[in-house]
């Protein structure tokens, strides 16, 4: 039997086969990104099986579904979007250069066929309703008929999206352009070699499918080869002659995860009418029972039991029956390579629980199977090798898989995967104005490539951020800092230096609970904890009270010396309180209201002035006298201070010494004595005591802590804590819509700060509202694991960048917060060390992104450019050599290019 290929038309986002009339068919496709289960637990595989059974159940008698799966190297759309983002947002030479290097490298790999990507599409095909053209219903207009089918496809799409969207999949209804491009790719395997910029230029909706996409005949191959030659490629066809005897979830991976490209799987599925099937089986059972009564053969008894069980299974709805046709096509420019592919595919089929593949010897049969696999065409008249199968078994052999690509469609950074794929990640997620920062933690041992990975991610994402703060030790980021801002030098934090960061300076913001917590925590670190826990609590209470009294004193001083300004501030405080209550949510703080009203004033000056003026003098006076209002007014005063006007560490120490009285007088004097070494005349100079002289005006601030000796661990912890709070105020003053980020070189140091847990948690949660992304680095996981900041850091982080680990117990501990499948745990333990790799070196890590549905887990390989390695390497010998080589360059990027 020789068939002719089907023809039809694209229009109104559907495909019409054989005319929109009785005997015709109408289809629509859906582009599907299957849930990425490569590193998932068995529970997720079982859940996918259940979802696929539900998908099959949506088919009504007479309707058919087709699963189209193929593998190629097409990352064109995502790479072009990445390039467009570079052109649009990257103003920095270094970021431009590194992003362009990745784009060019990946584009070349794509054109050379070195990349691999699986694609999955679903097609639903419905017969055109014959009654629509009959006398009983009257003749429907073409548009009305199409509208009816479009609505049915729309509902199917909503169902499929709801089904797989909850487990991390994505479903996109295909348009006319999508249908055309799928057919063009399907019928023209040489299309990628033609380097056509926009295939849609060739789309003519007035022409049929064959006129648009079918540009050559198939001709038979000479024996002993089977199949046909078409579009410069040799094609071979296989079909499943017998299906697996038993199935399990992910069984189809044996076919979809082969290590080569250019083959496709097509599964045509037809639901069986259960009532008719039961009736037919009942008749068969009656006949077999009669034969058994006559012959008494054991074989007939077994057949009776099988048929009875089948009838019972279908009658109680335990299973649903389907018919399916499973077609495999492979193509290659070489006959020998095609034979090798077909051999590998046959072996893969055999491994699927004793399934068997059939290779048609006749070119006519091969063509018929080819025509039966055309996209959307599941009603071919070629009835060979259709099989009856139950729903769960059908679900397990469907090629429902796709390549793990992470967040590639909206990637801010891109890396290689482990199977020829590209993987993307992002620091913000959401849609439109609802983008939120996805705080991250990177964990890795020494030599795992942690520094190179961190700087590479910072480089690729730099175009999207307005400000970067780095607190590090070891000068790992010193060269990168200069690539962002040529004038930026590391801010050296050391004892007895000239750097001063006043921890009592609110940096132009009102006094807030968050600032008070930090301002009390730092002196508490300075005085240390007592072995007596009650005495420690007393110290903290006394210090908090003293800090509050100090702010009270300075606020009164301001009110007495700036009476006119104080009156205006009272009106502003009253207006801010009303603004928060009337226009902001119940969770908004006074600080939130201050920042939002400031932006509101800049954008709507007249309206803001009117809002301030609406309160009369008596209302303002009453607000200022009220206890809560007076507190808000006191806090607002500090937003008007100049750096030299703020209280300083020395003032706190003097207050404790001068006002020591009552039952705790001795303790207060003792605290004053303990705080004295931290004053300007003490052991650490002006670092904590004096007028702030660090001005954060550029795009990046790099604080270097390596000049503080390891023996001064408390000083290093205090400095890191001070930096975090100092830059936090700067970020909160910037426009909220701009992205900012904090990079903490060793976040475990915050554990040494009393109340460090509280401040880290509040900082993470509070700064999320101000578009601040945090990246915390952990090298000493043992110290981090036992600290009290582990909870707030991991609890507020959505991304885990997991480098090579050497201690399995650390990975198990991480699983308490980030449920890590056993397969991923094994992979993390075996990530290679970059320095021990032979040939091309790379830093491999696991990208774990939590989601409200389920975690996204992919493996990334950072094949860094020579320039990136030169910039980011932190080894001692390389550091000294690089410093000498770059010394003479005003433009550090030019120096990197010249010496890399």
Each model region followed by its residue ranges:
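Extended, folded cores of ATP/NTP-driven motor/assembly subunits in large transport
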Residues: 1-387
């Amino acid at each position: 039997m020789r068939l002719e290929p089907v023809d039809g038309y694209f229009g109104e986002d559907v495909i019409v086969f054989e005319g929109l009339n009785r005997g015709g068919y109408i289809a629509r496709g859906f582009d599907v990104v299957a849930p990425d289960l490569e590193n998932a637990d068995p529970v997720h595989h079982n859940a996918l099986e259940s979802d696929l059974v539900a998908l099959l159940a949506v088919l009504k008698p007479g309707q058919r579904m087709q699963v189209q799966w193929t593998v190629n190297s097409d990352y064109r759309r995502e790479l072009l979007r990445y390039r467009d983002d570079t052109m649009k947002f990257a103003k920095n030479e270094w970021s431009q250069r590194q992003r362009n290097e990745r784009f060019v490298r990946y584009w070349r790999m794509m054109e050379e066929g070195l990349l691999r990507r699986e694609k999955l599409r679903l097609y639903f095909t419905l017969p055109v309703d014959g009654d629509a053209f009959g006398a009983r219903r009257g003749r429907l207009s073409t548009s009305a008929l199409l509208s009816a089918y479009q609505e049915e496809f729309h509902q199917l799409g909503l169902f499929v999206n709801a089904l797989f969207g909850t487990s991390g999949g994505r479903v996109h209804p295909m348009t006319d352009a999508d249908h055309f491009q799928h057919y063009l790719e399907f019928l023209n395997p040489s299309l990628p070699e033609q380097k056509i910029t926009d295939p849609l230029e060739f789309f003519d909706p007035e022409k049929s499918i064959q006129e648009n996409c079918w540009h050559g005949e198939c001709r038979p191959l000479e024996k002993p080869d089977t199949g046909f030659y078409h579009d410069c490629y040799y094609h071979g066809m296989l079909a499943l002659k017998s299906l697996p005897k038993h199935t399990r979830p992910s069984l189809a991976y044996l076919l979809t995860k082969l290590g080569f490209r250019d083959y496709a799987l097509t599964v045509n599925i037809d639901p069986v009418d259960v009532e008719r099937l039961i009736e037919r089986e009942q008749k068969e059972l009656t006949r077999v029972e009669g034969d058994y009564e006559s012959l008494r053969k054991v074989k007939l008894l077994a057949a009776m039991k099988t048929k009875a069980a089948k009838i019972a299974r279908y009658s109680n709805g335990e299973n649903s029956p389907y018919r399916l046709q499973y077609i495999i096509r492979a193509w290659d420019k070489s006959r020998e390579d095609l034979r090798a592919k077909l051999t590998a595919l046959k072996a893969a089929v055999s491994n699927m629980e004793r399934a068997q593949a059939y290779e048609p010897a006749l070119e006519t049969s091969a063509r018929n199977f080819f025509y039966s696999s055309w996209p959307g065409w599941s009603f071919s008249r070629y009835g060979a090798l259709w099989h009856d199968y139950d729903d769960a078994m059908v679900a397990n052999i469907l090629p429902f898989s796709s390549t793990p690509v992470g967040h590639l469609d909206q990637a801010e950074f891109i890396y290689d995967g482990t199977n020829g794929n590209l993987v993307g990640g992002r620091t913000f997620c959401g849609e439109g104005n609802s983008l939120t920062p996805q705080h991250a933690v990177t964990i890795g041992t020494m030599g795992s490539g942690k520094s190179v990975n961190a700087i590479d991610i910072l480089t690729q994402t730099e175009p999207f951020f307005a400000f970067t703060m780095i607190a590090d030790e070891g000068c790992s980021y010193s060269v990168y800092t200069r690539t962002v801002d040529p004038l930026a030098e590391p801010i050296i934090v050391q004892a007895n230096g000239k750097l001063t960061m006043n921890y009592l300076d609110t940096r132009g913001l009102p006094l807030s609970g968050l600032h008070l917590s930090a301002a009390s925590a730092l002196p508490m670190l300075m005085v240390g904890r007592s072995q007596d826990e009650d005495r420690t609590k007393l110290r903290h209470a006394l210090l908090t009270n003293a800090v509050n009294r100090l702010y009270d004193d300075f606020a009164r001083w301001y009110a007495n010396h700036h009476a006119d300004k104080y009156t205006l501030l009272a009106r502003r405080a009253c207006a801010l309180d009303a603004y928060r209550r009337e226009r902001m949510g119940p969770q908004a703080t006074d600080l939130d209201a201050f920042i939002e009203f400031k932006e509101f004033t800049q954008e709507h000056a007249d309206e803001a002035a009117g809002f301030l003026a609406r309160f009369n003098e008596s209302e303002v006076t009453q607000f200022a006298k009220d206890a809560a209002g007076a507190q808000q007014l006191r806090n607002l005063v500090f937003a008007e201070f100049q750096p030299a006007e703020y209280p300083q560490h020395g003032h706190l120490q003097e207050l404790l010494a001068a006002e020591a009285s009552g039952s705790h007088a001795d303790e207060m004097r003792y605290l004053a004595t303990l705080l004295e070494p931290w004053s300007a005349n003490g052991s650490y100079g002006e670092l904590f005591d004096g007028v702030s002289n660090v001005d954060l005006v550029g795009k990046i601030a790099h604080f270097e802590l390596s000049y503080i000796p390891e023996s001064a661990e408390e000083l290093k912890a205090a400095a890191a804590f001070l930096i975090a709070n100092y830059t936090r105020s700067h970020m909160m003053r910037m426009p909220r819509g701009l992205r900012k980020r904090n990079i903490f070189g060793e976040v475990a140091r915050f554990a040494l700060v009393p109340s460090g847990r509280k401040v880290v948690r509040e900082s993470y949660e509070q700064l999320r509202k101000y578009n601040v992304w945090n990246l915390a680095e952990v090298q000493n996981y043992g110290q981090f694991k036992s600290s009290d900041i582990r909870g707030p850091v991991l609890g507020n982080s959505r991304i885990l960048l997991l480098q090579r680990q050497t201690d399995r117990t650390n990975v198990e501990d991480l699983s308490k917060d980030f449920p890590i499948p056993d397969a991923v745990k094994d992979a993390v333990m075996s990530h290679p060390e970059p320095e021990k790799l032979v040939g091309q070196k790379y830093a491999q890590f696991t990208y774990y992104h939590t989601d409200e549905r389920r975690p996204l887990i992919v493996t990334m390989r950072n094949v860094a450019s020579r320039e990136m390695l030169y910039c980011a390497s932190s080894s001692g010998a390389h550091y000294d050599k690089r410093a000498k080589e770059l010394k003479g360059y005003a433009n550090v990027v030019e120096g990197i290019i010249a010496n890399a």
